[in-house]
């Protein structure tokens, strides 16, 4: 019998995303290539702590999710959309910010991604 693994919601989300792959032309790639986030007072999902924990628990076989801290929420989503376009819509980045003005700034980038049919994952 296996031992129960206790995770927070944020840790479970990150662990799930790290294990999502897409296969095309016989090549397997991670669907969510990494995470970008600007953390402030209202990040309720616990994603920041989960990303740090994922980095600390990383194994040599590449089980970690890279994290970048951008300076602007709209630019962050636009960068994720550009990455999705560059990889032929087979990979994208996860974007997260605090609740409030930061989330609202992400909406414009999400509209651009939606109008161009580019995948981005927003938290």
Question: What role is predicted for each listed range?
Answer:
Residues 1-102:
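Thiamine diphosphate
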Residues 92, 102-105, 109-123:
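Hydrophobic or amphipathic alpha-helical targeting/insertion segments
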């Amino acid at each position: 019998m296996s031992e129960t693994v206790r995770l927070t919601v944020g840790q479970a989300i990150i662990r799930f995303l790290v294990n999502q792959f897409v296969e095309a032309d016989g090549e397997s790639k991670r669907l969510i290539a990494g995470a970008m986030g600007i953390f402030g007072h209202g990040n309720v999902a616990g994603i920041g702590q989960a990303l740090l924990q994922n980095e600390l628990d990383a194994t040599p076989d590449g089980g970690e999710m890279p994290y970048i801290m951008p300076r602007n929420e709209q630019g962050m989503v636009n960068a994720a959309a550009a990455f999705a376009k560059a990889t032929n819509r087979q990979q994208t980045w996860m974007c997260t910010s605090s609740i409030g003005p930061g989330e609202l700034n992400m909406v414009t980038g999400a509209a651009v991604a939606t109008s161009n049919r580019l995948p981005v994952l927003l938290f």
